[in-house]
């Protein structure tokens, strides 16, 4: 696996920024036990590191439809047959919302600036 310094080599500044935000998202998701979306972010990170021009579109696909990345809330716990919020759920979701919004903005800007079919 590449270190943060190695991952940015050969990437545009916009792709480096997207890589950084998506990496933060992946860590936040994994830290809360959210495997599905963490794996999605890992695939986008790998695509960015490989120079795949479709990486922004791969990320943007996570945002559409029911059950999408937009619908995710962190800090939930289900134990002993009961749903409850973790003590840090508010902070987790504030951070998730900020990163999720920034990732969408960056991916959209990169996609829109890239010539070719979508």
Locations of the language-model features?
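Short terminal alpha-helical segments
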Residues: 2-44, 100-115
């Amino acid at each position: 696996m590449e270190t943060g310094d190695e991952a940015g080599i050969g990437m545009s500044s916009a792709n480096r920024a997207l890589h950084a935000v998506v990496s933060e998202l992946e860590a936040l998701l994994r830290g809360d036990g959210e495997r599905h979306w963490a794996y999605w972010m890992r695939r986008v990170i790998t695509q960015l590191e490989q120079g795949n021009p479709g990486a922004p579109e791969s990320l943007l696909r996570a945002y559409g439809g029911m059950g999408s990345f937009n619908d995710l809330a962190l800090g939930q716990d289900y134990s002993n047959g009961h749903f409850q919020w973790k003590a840090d759920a508010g902070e987790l979701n504030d951070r998730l919302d900020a990163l999720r919004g920034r990732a969408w903005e960056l991916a959209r800007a990169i996609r829109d600036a890239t010539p070719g079919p979508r």
